[in-house]
């Protein structure tokens, strides 16, 4: 890998973007960033608080700025927020600045992986499965639209998925 390329991980909540991203960055000797963690660092508050105080629109504005800033770097792996692809500007930005990897998973896996996580504001409802299904209907076509590579994450360890990504990218 002569030039430092950016790798952007997109996909739904619970697909494993952050965990897989850390492994991938380590294996490729790249810097790892997580857009949600970066928002928390910049605001000094957790994502749930940002949602409560600024609403989803305020959160999405912050997310767009963080992704724009981080994607200016060279040689990073960036785990994006699941809803970031709903912004056409962000989709264009990611496509232009690096390789987009869609981490695909089933609704069942999403439910299993997120059921105890109280830090996901959109899932703090009576029926999180219904929310995940609704989000998938909107977002999955957008993930597919910008993906250079699609990798399924069901029933595989983060390390195995990271290796599959490296193999598919030819690194």
UniProtKB/Swiss-Prot annotation:
Belongs to the shikimate kinase family. It catalyses: shikimate + ATP = 3-phosphoshikimate + ADP + H(+). Transmembrane segments: none annotated. Binds 1 Mg(2+) ion per subunit. GO terms for cellular component: cytosol. Catalyzes the specific phosphorylation of the 3-hydroxyl group of shikimic acid using ATP as a cosubstrate. The keyword Transmembrane helix does not apply. It holds the Pfam family SKI. It comes from Shewanella sp. (strain W3-18-1). CDD domains: SK. This is Shikimate kinase.
